[in-house]
């Protein structure tokens, strides 16, 4: 499994599928879901030649279960940590429910 450590020390799980030089689509799940909820969409876009990424937001799925940091500022910072770790530039961000709020705060 793949993880990145955020600036405040939280372990965030991520999926990163596809060619590293392909256009990137980054998926953000809703509450109380996980990255797995995007698998069908990720498989579709992977088949179309995209690099697809999804995370389990802090406190969800395989990411570290923490009591604090459950706000849009931390979620956006967590996204930035994954983007930096993976060296992503120019990604399209797609969010559902709370994930949409994360996208709005991040961009």
Where do the protein language model's features map onto the residues?
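Active-site loop/oxyanion-hole signature of alpha/beta-hydrolase fold enzymes
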Residues: 7, 47, 51-94, 98
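N-terminal cap/lid segment of alpha/beta-hydrolase-fold proteins
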Residues: 1-11
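Generic alpha-helical structural signal
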Residues: 39, 76-80, 104
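Conserved HGGG/HGGXW glycine-rich cap/lid loop of the alpha/beta-hydrolase fold
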Residues: 10-65
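Short glycine-enriched nucleophile-adjacent loop
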Residues: 100-107
């Amino acid at each position: 499994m793949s993880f990145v450590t955020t600036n405040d020390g939280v372990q965030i799980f991520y999926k990163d599928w596809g060619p590293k030089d392909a256009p990137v689509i980054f998926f953000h799940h809703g509450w109380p879901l996980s990255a797995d909820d995007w698998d069908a969409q990720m498989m579709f876009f992977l088949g179309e030649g995209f690099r697809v990424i999804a995370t389990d937001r802090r406190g969800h799925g395989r990411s570290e279960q923490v009591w604090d940091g459950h706000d849009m500022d931390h979620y956006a910072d967590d996204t930035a940590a994954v983007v930096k770790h993976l060296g992503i530039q120019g990604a399209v961000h797609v969010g559902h429910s709370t994930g949409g709020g994360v996208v709005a705060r991040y961009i």
